[in-house]
């Protein structure tokens, strides 16, 4: 995989971002892309590429839900769901941050669900960037540390455990 990625040159990071974004829209597990980004591009570039792909995919999912499904879903929902949507809209970006930091709803599903609300797009994007950044850093570090460990770097396990600790602190 690494040789193939290197053979792509400048297209490798672009391809990673596009695949991550497309995978997000199609409900592929983001953790796989996050780990791959760290393993293939290192912790810093991997984080930036992962965050770019994740936010592009999240935004695309949000927009698909908003412009292709929101009216239809709203027309079919009952009073209870309409109250939930209204409550989410009232909290706006704060709800987005909370939902991202306390992942009770899977990432890909959350993107579509939030698109059914009237939360402003800019608020959604900025809140998502802010709240997704810590986990994105952790996944890139874990991917990088895993690759280093496979390459025989004994110190990589220490870095991997540190990244897992950060991820656990974010999750709980």
Residue locations for each model-derived region?
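Membrane-helix boundary/juxtamembrane motif in polytopic membrane proteins
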Residues: 117-131
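Membrane-interfacial helix-loop-helix
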Residues: 1-18, 51-112, 116-117, 121, ...
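C-terminal membrane module of polytopic membrane proteins
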Residues: 131-172
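Transmembrane helix boundary and interhelical junction motifs in multipass membrane proteins
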Residues: 17-48, 104-110, 122, 132-139
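Structural signature of transmembrane alpha-helix termini at the membrane-water interface
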Residues: 22-25, 63, 141, 170-171
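Hydrophobic alpha-helical transmembrane segments
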Residues: 13-17, 32-36, 44-52, 94-98, ...
């Amino acid at each position: 995989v690494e040789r193939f990625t290197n053979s792509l040159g400048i297209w490798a990071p672009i391809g990673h971002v596009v695949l991550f974004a497309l995978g997000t829209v199609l409900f592929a597990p983001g953790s796989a892309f996050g780990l791959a980004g760290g393993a293939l591009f290192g912790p810093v570039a991997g984080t930036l590429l992962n965050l770019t792909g994740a936010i592009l995919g999240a935004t695309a999912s949000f927009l698909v839900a908003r412009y292709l499904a929101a009216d239809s879903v709203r027309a079919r929902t009952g009073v209870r769901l309409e109250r939930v949507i209204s409550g989410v809209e009232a909290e706006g970006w704060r709800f987005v941050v909370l939902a991202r930091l306390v992942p009770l709803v899977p990432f890909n599903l959350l993107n579509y669900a939030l698109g059914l609300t009237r939360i402003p797009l800019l608020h959604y994007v900025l809140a998502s960037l802010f709240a997704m950044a810590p986990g994105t850093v952790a996944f890139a570090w874990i991917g990088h540390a895993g690759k280093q460990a496979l390459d025989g770097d004994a110190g990589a396990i220490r870095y991997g455990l540190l990244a897992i600790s950060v991820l656990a602190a974010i999750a709980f």
